[in-house]
Amino acid sequence: MKSYVGIGKGNAADAVGEAVKGIGNPSCIIFLSSFGQIGEIAAIIAEKFPGVPSIGTLGTKLANGKYGDDNLVVLGFYDDAKTECGVINDISLCPVASIGDIKDKVNKVSPGRENTVCIEFCTNDEEKLVTTFNSCLAQKGVKLAGGTVFGVPDGKKPIVAYNGKIFEDSCVYAIIKN
């Protein structure tokens, strides 16, 4: 499976420009940003790559041997990987309401037991999400990895990004088949 990892620093536009330099034509983008820039970065990525699904989270990043809180990391996947992305809203209330949508996305990638993973980033209520995802993924042998956002300033609500937009009380995910 062909993939790309890029790192950028500076203001949102410069960070995205640097991080996607050489990415080409991805079929899916996953990014990790800082709290202060995630909204602008999500919008820039959606504008630069129209029609390409993207998910994003925030926290401390490690990529290409570099570590930091103030950088942007972009991971790109290409057509040799089948991908489906989505968002689950109101996860503190009823994430199971999204089971039908998750199952549809899983079926679209035609997962195999050893070649498919679901990566998720959530704002809260990870324990509810694990149950929701497992009900959709376990029977197909799809592995689940991910976590809760980190690095939210005091007094602010945790957020994640999906296709250029920011969401609270939500989970974004990518199902990736090699």
Language model feature labels by segment:
Residues M1-N178:
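Cofactor- and metal-binding active-site motifs of prokaryotic enzymes
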